[in-house]
Regions:
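Gly/Ala-rich beta-loop-alpha elbow adjacent to hydrolase catalytic centers
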Residues: 167-172, 176
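Short, solvent-exposed loop/turn elements at domain surfaces
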Residues: 23-25, 93-94, 231-234
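Flexible, membrane-associating and regulatory peripheral segments of lipid-active enzymes
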Residues: 1-87, 285, 289-290, 294, ...
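Conserved short loop/turn motifs at secondary-structure junctions
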Residues: 29-31, 163-167
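A conserved cap/lid and substrate-binding interface adjacent to the catalytic center
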Residues: 37-164, 182-189, 194, 198-200, ...
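Serine hydrolase/lipase
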Residues: 79-82, 117, 121-124, 135, ...
Length: 323
């Protein structure tokens, strides 16, 4: 039995995998598997995480990066066939500029346009023309400026697809919510991790200009946020959906940038939540959080102490505090 907590952990790992660069379909097989795992480690995964992830997920399309800074990886769950769009968060100067636009303008326009255009290419069969748009003057209102652009050849990787999951951390989570708004017939589930929100009137005014079946943000967006210390970015704007607050070990912004905002501390914490949920699928986030907070007197040892306690209960001949 899979619980919601198990799913939050799985999607956190996929959000981390969005930071892997240079993925190509050929990495799924043979000797190229090592390159796949190396790319995942470059995105922040541990050796064990990378090996397990590469065994569980296949690469659907080459890593997409464009001039706006948008970066997307597309994966397929080898067991269920589930397709996942994993959108990268802030990673370079272009993303920093997009973040600045988001904070002051309520939504990141260039990457929103790039995301729409890329998904249209994924949906359009290879060899056929995919509709594209451009954001250009003259602007007649707060969110206008979206016009038809010359069509380009489709990629076809998601031709005929539905029930797709989209996930992302930080700016990637913000864009995941955008994808769910622009492509409601394609996207079934949306997960965001420490993602900034929107100035909703400004965002709606922009997104309403896009062609297609865009209507409103869905209500089933799941927003997973670190509930420890200072997490400024996830408090920006309004993010539609349901927040899920996860207790993490408090991170130093100086010695472990970007501190509590990073995807790694959140994924590490969710690994412990996932372990508890695997033992008891009826457990809730709130209950696991209570256990973790009671596990140690210092945030720095909370996860280790909780894991040691479980090992003491379930692992034969385990001495508390052993590696």
């Amino acid at each position: 039995m899979t619980s919601a907590i198990n799913e939050y952990f799985d999607q956190a790992q996929l959000s981390m995998a969005a930071y892997a660069a240079g993925l190509v379909v050929e990495m799924n097989m043979g000797e190229n598997r090592d390159a796949y795992e190396d790319a995942l480690r470059g995105g922040g995964m541990s050796n064990a995480q990378a090996t397990r992830f590469a065994a569980e997920y296949s690469i659907v399309s080459t890593t997409y990066i464009d001039i706006s800074g948008l970066a997307v990886n597309v994966f397929r769950d080898n067991e269920t066939g589930q397709i996942v769009l994993a959108i990268r968060g802030t990673n370079d100067v272009l993303d920093i500029l997009s973040n600045a636009e988001l904070y002051f303008g309520g939504i990141t326009r260039p990457q929103t346009v790039s995301l729409y255009n890329y998904v249209q290419r994924l949906l359009t069969p290879a060899g056929q023309l995919a509709p594209q748009v451009i954001d250009a003057p003259p602007y007649s209102g707060t969110g206008s400026g979206i016009y038809a652009a010359p069509a380009v050849l489709g990629l076809g990787y998601l031709s005929g697809a539905s029930g797709v999951t989209v996930t992302g951390h930080s700016l990637g989570g913000h864009l995941s919510a955008v994808a769910s708004r622009l492509f409601p017939s394609l996207i079934q589930s949306t997960y965001t991790y420490n993602a900034p929100g929107f100035n909703l009137p400004v965002a709606d005014a922009l997104l309403d200009q896009f062609p297609g079946d865009a209507g409103a943000f869905p209500s089933n967006i799941t927003n997973v946020v670190a509930d420890t210390g200072v997490t400024v970015i996830s408090n920006v704007g309004d993010l539609p959906g349901t927040p899920k607050r996860i207790f993490i070990e408090d991170q130093s912004l100086i010695t472990n940038f970007p501190g509590n905002h990073g995807i790694a501390p959140l994924t590490d914490a969710l690994a412990i939540y996932n372990l508890f949920a695997t033992i008891d699928p009826t457990g809730t986030i709130e209950r696991v959080t209570e256990i973790l907070k009671a596990s140690a007197t210092t945030d720095k040892k909370t996860l280790e102490t909780a894991l040691d306690s479980l090992r003491t209960l379930f692992q034969e001949n385990y001495a508390f505090g052993s590696p």
